[in-house]
Structures are given as C-alpha cells and as structure tokens.
From Swiss-Prot:
Organism phylogeny: Bacteria, Pseudomonadati, Pseudomonadota, Gammaproteobacteria, Pasteurellales
Gene, per the UniProt record: der
A GO BP annotation: ribosome biogenesis
Quaternary organization: Associates with the 50S ribosomal subunit.
Entry protein name: GTPase Der
Role description: GTPase that plays an essential role in the late steps of ribosome biogenesis.
Alphabetized UniProt keyword annotations: GTP-binding, Nucleotide-binding, Repeat, Ribosome biogenesis
A Pfam family: KH_dom-like
NCBIfam families: GTPase_EngA, small_GTP
Matches recorded under HAMAP family: GTPase_Der
Length: 510
C-alpha cells in the first residue's frame, strides 16, 4: 500500500513549520533537509491516529509579486502535484490576504486534489468569527487548529486521511472487513487483553506459532529499492542488475507515482526492483526534475524490503546521504551500502574513501558495504548475497524461549543498574514482529532503564541472533501483561494482525 503524501502549503509565517514539527514529532521522525533541490525543502515521516504518511513543508509562497506559478519553486509544484492531500494553511489572526487568494486560485485549478483550508493560530481568539472570511476562498470547510499547542491536529489528520484509507480498503475487501469490525461488539478485544497471558508458556508458544505462520504466509518476493542522490549511478546499477542472469523482466508501472516496479528472477528467487529514477523510454523523459524526486524515493523506501543506498565514491558521504540513511533506519528497512564508481580510483583515494566511510557511518556497522562499478559490472553480482542475507535476518524466526534465554545471558554478564535502591529486573522477552525484528522485553521499572543499557541489550541480541543488514527494535513493557485492563484504540494494521493471531490461537486451543 502506497504511503500517502501530505503537502503543507501557504504563505510565509502561517505556521507550516510548526505544524510540520508537530506532525513528525509524533514518531520522533527524522526531518530530512535536502539541499540543492530548492530552498529549505523539508520531508518527514509521521503517524497520526494510526495512519503512516509522508509530510512535506513546501516553504513560504508569496502569490502577489510574480504570480503563484512563477514564484513557486519547481519542487513546491512537484510536491503539490504528487501529494494526496494538500493542507492550505492560513493565519486566523492576520486574516485573509491577497497572497492567500492567489494561492487559492492556483489550488482551485487542481480539482483532483484533496485540498483542506486550515486556519492556524486560533488559540486565544474567537476562532469562528476570525475564520469566517476564509470561506470566500471557495475551497470548502475551514478547519481550525493551534499547531503550537497541538490542538485539533490529530482530529484534522484523521479526517483528511480516512477517505484515502477507505479508498485503499475498497480495493482490498478482506482488509476492509477486518478494519470495520466493531471490536467492542465482538468482545475479541477483551479476550485478547485479559485471556492472553504472556507469562504462560502455552500462550507464548501459541503466539510463537502464530507469528511463524504469518511469516510463512508472506510473499517471498524480495522488493529492492535503489536510492541515492542524483547522478550516483542508480539507473546504471538498475540496468546492470537486470542485464545479469535475468529470466523474466518487464516494465510494470507501480502504484507509487512514476516509480517503476520491475519483476525479475535470479537463481530461483523472485525480486522486484523499485527504480526511483524512473526507468522508461528515452522519448518519454521530458523534465529534468524526474531524475530525482524526494517523494518517490521516500515512498520506495517505505515499500521495500531491502534498500540499496548508493553513494558516489568520488564525492564521498554527504549530509543528504545521511538524511536518506536516517529515513531508511526510521522506516526499519534492511540496508546494503553500495559505493559506486570504484573503478579508476588509485589506492590512496580508495583508502581515504574507506576511512571516511568508517568515520561517518560507524553507527550502522551492521550493514554490508560493497564497492562496485555499475558501469563495468564489477562487484554487482555479489550484492545479491548481501540482499538475501539482510532479508533472511530481518524475517528470521524467533521464539519466546530463545529470546528469554538470551536476555538471561545478557543480564548475567552485565546486570541492570540499581534505581532508587532497587535493581531493575528484566523478566522475559518474546517476539513482537519482524522486518525489522522486534523484541519485547518485560520487567520492572522499565521506564528507568538507561539508554546505555538498552543499547547494550540491542547489541547483545544482534550478536546472539547474528542479525546482519537489518535494524533491530527493542520494546520495553512493564509487568507481566501490559495489555490487561486496557482498551486502547487499535490502528487498522493492528486490527488486521490481531484478527489473524486470534483466529490462529482459537483454532489451536480447540
């Protein structure tokens, strides 16, 4: 399912950056600045009311001086064109301006876009009277928020994203039926909360089996996204991969706009190459901006199983590479570092490049690094070994007994610290998901466990499970059953997963 894109549009100083920070902070998401595309474009990943989406701050637009279309930068236009939802921010305190009218005239021409007028800075004023004049813009209802305080933000995002989710569910009736299940009427939420005991060996065994069955049912086709800055050789690498030992290759336009999904087979394994550069016939490439779209890249990362981050050996690791890397890790995707254009460099320069990689990428020492020449093909074939290794590690089977045993060994070697005269106690661990591997650790005083000890546990699990090429996530829960007595509203994804697990557990208990 394609991740929805939300673009924030408006004149300067209406609170777009404040809303952007409010949205992305909900998941502590990386805010990626990509210099050189247009001035201060910002892209981030966010989650509101159970919906994952990409949010874009298009920067301030002044529609009064040279006309909206001329004043907008190319990337701002592209963001609006590729967005699923456009949030048009206006300042409730300042009132309607000629710049607002100019922007509204442009947006009104894009009738195929979901456009919502959002009146910001409504705190401390009579919001209804101040917002009345914005109805003249002719863009429908005016939503009221106070981005600096977060008031109305969650309700706004849930309102604008719900129609997109319904449209996607309509294309998948089975998923829609699951998401529309009334949890309170079926009573299954209570059964999951109160009857399932994580401390009970029989129940944890059933959970292990349910997760294993779900893992087994997953599509074994590995989706590979090739991402990187402009002119690092992404298209050359794609063509080189497709030209090497291929069996079935054809161009299939994907649901992610303008990205091309290319199925292929190699040594009996099915892959899908996601080319963010847009592999198409030469005659159809008209705009230089198609060479690199941040939006397409971020969506490809979300949709992939393994990401090949391509770096130009002659230019080294840039801040933009690190921004992309941060987004990959935040999305939990498996990673292979590809250093391209390795041919023709003398040994001194190669040593300098390797030294810089070690220095700037020391925080991702779990990822394999390959030095290749996409143009000449040297080293390209070896990429598939690392791709398969990373995917296998990200989807490997884990059991409660295995994870608890590793936890006990880790605490025996290095005990948790004392807090308030009491030692923090880690009781047991169980699998919480895969791709990336998620390990849920239960114990007492989890909120007081230092970050340094969490890193120690993460590294210990990585070494013990031999996880290469994939991030690993640890979740810390207080007590035996953190779900007992709680009736949290589940997200659509959680509803689908809970439905599958409960169905399996009920069948196993008969």
């Amino acid at each position: 399912m394609t991740t929805p894109v939300v673009a924030l549009v408006g004149r300067p100083n209406v609170g777009k950056s404040t809303l952007f920070n409010r949205l992305t902070r909900t998941r502590d998401a990386l805010v990626a600045d990509f210099p050189g595309l247009t001035r201060d474009r910002k892209y981030g990943q966010a989650n509101i009311a159970g919906y994952d989406f990409i949010v874009i701050d298009t920067g301030g637009i002044d529609g009064t001086e040279e006309g909206v279309e001329e004043k907008m930068a190319e990337q701002s236009l592209l963001a609006i064109e590729e967005a699923d939802v456009v949030l048009f921010l206006v300042d409730a305190r300042a009132g309607l301006t000629s710049a607002d009218i100019g922007i509204a005239n442009y947006l009104r021409q894009r009738q195929n876009k979901i456009t919502v007028v959002v009146a910001n800075k409504t705190d401390g004023i009579d919001a209804d009277s101040h917002c009345a004049e914005f109805y003249q813009l002719g863009l429908g209802e005016v939503e009221q928020i106070a981005a600096s305080q977060g008031r109305g933000v969650s309700a706004l995002m849930e309102q604008v994203l719900a129609p997109i989710a319904e449209k996607m569910n309509a294309e998948s009736p089975e998923q829609s039926a699951v998401e529309n299940t009334d949890v309170s009427e079926t009573g299954e939420q209570d059964e999951w909360d109160h009857d399932f005991d994580f401390a009970n060996e029989e129940d944890t065994a059933l959970l292990d089996d349910a997760i294993a069955e779900e893992l087994e049912a997953q599509d074994k086709n590995i989706k590979i996204a090739i991402v990187g800055r402009p002119n690092v050789g992404k298209s050359t690498l794609t063509n080189r991969i497709l030209g090497e030992d291929r069996v079935v290759v054809y161009d299939l336009p994907g649901t992610t706009r303008d990205s091309i999904y290319i199925p292929m087979e190699r040594d009996g394994q099915h892959y899908t190459i996601i080319d963010t550069a847009g592999v198409r016939k030469r005659g159809k490439v008209h705009l230089a901006v198609e060479k690199f779209s941040v939006i397409k890249t971020l969506q490809a990362i979300q949709d992939a199983n393994v990401v090949l981050l391509t770096i130009d050996a002659r230019e080294g690791v840039s801040d933009q590479d690190l921004s992309l890397l941060g987004f990959i890790l935040n999305a939990g995707r498996s990673l292979v570092i590809v250093v391209n254009k390795w041919d023709g460099l003398n040994q001194d320069i190669k040593d300098q490049v390797k030294s810089e990689l070690d220095r700037r990428l020391d925080f991702i020492d779990f990822a394999r690094v390959h030095f290749i020449s996409a143009l000449h093909g040297s080293g390209v074939g070896n990429l598939f070994d690392s791709i398969q290794e990373a995917y296998a590690c990200a989807t490997q089977k884990m059991t409660t007994s295995m994870l608890t045993r590793i936890l006990q060994m880790a605490t025996d070697e290095h005990q948790p610290p004392m807090m308030g005269g009491r030692r923090i106690k880690l009781k047991y661990a169980h699998p919480g998901g895969y791709n990336p591997p998620i390990i849920v650790v239960h114990g007492n005083q989890m909120d007081k466990l230092p970050d340094s000890y969490k890193r120690y546990l993460s590294n210990y699990y990585r070494r013990s499970l031999k996880i290469i090429g994939s991030p690993i996530r640890l979740l810390f829960q207080e007590g035996n059953n953190p779900f007992a007595g709680k009736r949290n509203k589940l997200t659509p994804n959680q509803l689908r997963k809970r439905k599958r697990l409960m169905k399996f557990i009920k069948k196993s208990k008969r």
